[in-house]
Design a protein with these regions (language model features):
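Short amphipathic alpha-helical segments and helix-helix/interface helices
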Residues: 26-29, 59-63, 130-136, 218-221
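Short, basic, helix/turn surface patches
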Residues: 66-74, 100-105, 167-185, 256-277
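Residue-level recognition of beta-strand->loop/alpha-helix junctions
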Residues: 43, 76, 147, 235-236
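C-terminal domain-boundary segment and adjacent tail
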Residues: 36, 145, 199, 209-290
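Glycine-enriched alpha-helix->loop->beta-strand junction motifs that scaffold or abut catalytic
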Residues: 68-69, 137-142
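Alpha-helical scaffold elements lining the catalytic groove of polysaccharide deacetylases
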Residues: 80-106, 125-139, 147-199, 213-216
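Active-site beta->alpha N-cap acidic-glycine motif
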Residues: 1-120, 205
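Short low-complexity, flexible loop/linker segments enriched in glycine and/or proline
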Residues: 55-58, 86-90, 158-162, 245-251
Length: 290
């Protein structure tokens, strides 16, 4: 299993950026090292320019990832939805999103660059999708897929607000639901791979650099290990031939690559077991973000 983290350096979710960002980064990296798990973090360069000036304290968070032996990828500068952007505007945001990750990865000696679309929206028209695919390839990027997602950004908002309100009982309930959904999503991915490829494949998990993931990661990795997983780099996971299957999906949504590959292969997947965020969590999220 490859572990991927979006929206680096940190997803504040309404709380003060520091000291939560430092605490979360440290906790994530400690857990990853403890489990000997490589990971890649996808960076929003715009977070480093908060307030109209370069934030060295935020740069330092990325340096922690590099010092821990992790990889960094491009997640654009401003995390804008490709569905709402022109091809040219999105290309500009990709270019603006690459200076820091290119510098840090070059210093690390890495020649492979990865890109993940914000919200994994890869193009709602064939023209836009094909144009950005070609643009990324020309700039030396590989598009980062994911086969497991757990909507951790939704759980995180509710979790952070519960902690801020001192409601430890609610926070515990949210965290338990989050872990349960992640394991259920993993089981669905394990069932889906053989339906497409007649065998198991390396899974790729999409997470975010946020509080709930940091505080749940140790539990999650232990559960993955008990299911027989070992942790590999994204590059190693993508060496499996399944990942060479083209993504031909044109959509406003950003589903996992299993649904995209199914479209390419002409296979109708059974959605049974594909989990949804519990209704009570979604309602709390809507209240918090409305």
């Amino acid at each position: 299993m490859a572990l991927t983290f979006d929206d680096l350096p940190f997803v504040a979710a309404g709380q003060p950026y520091f000291p939560a960002a430092t605490r979360t980064t440290t906790e994530l990296l400690q857990v990853l090292r403890r489990h000997r798990a490589p990971a890649i973090g996808f960076v929003n360069e715009g977070q480093l320019d908060a307030g109209g000036e370069r934030r060295r304290d935020r740069d330092a968070l990325l340096q922690q990832w590099i010092a821990a032996g992790m990889t960094l990828g491009n997640h654009t500068y401003a995390h804008r939805d490709f569905n709402t952007q022109t091809i040219e505007a999105f290309q500009d945001d990709i270019i603006k999103g690459e200076p820091t990750i290119k510098r840090l990865m070059a210093a690390k000696g890495s020649k492979t660059l990865f890109f993940r679309h914000p919200m994994t929206h890869t193009g709602e028209t064939k023209e836009k999708k094909d144009a950005i695919d070609a643009f990324l390839s020309a700039r030396g990027y590989r598009i980062a897929p994911h086969t497991i997602e757990n909507s951790d950004f939704i759980f995180n908002v509710v979790y952070v607000r519960a902690l801020a309100a001192g409601d430890r009982a609610l926070a515990g309930r949210v965290r338990e639901a989050y872990v349960d959904m992640t394991i259920t999503a993993t089981a669905f991915a394990e069932k889906t791979a053989p339906a497409l490829f007649k065998r198991e494949i390396p899974q790729t998990l999409l997470l975010h650099a946020n509080v709930i993931t940091a505080e749940s990661l140790g539990d999650l990795l232990s559960r993955f290990e008990s299911r027989g997983y070992r942790f590999v780099t994204l590059e190693d996971a993508m060496a499996d031939p399944a990942y060479a299957t083209p993504d031909t999906m044109v959509s406003t949504s950003g589903p996992t690559w299993f649904w995209r590959w199914a479209r390419t292969l002409g296979v109708r997947l059974n959605p049974e077991g594909d989990p949804e965020v519990p209704a009570w969590v979604m309602e709390a999220y809507r209240r918090a973000t409305s």
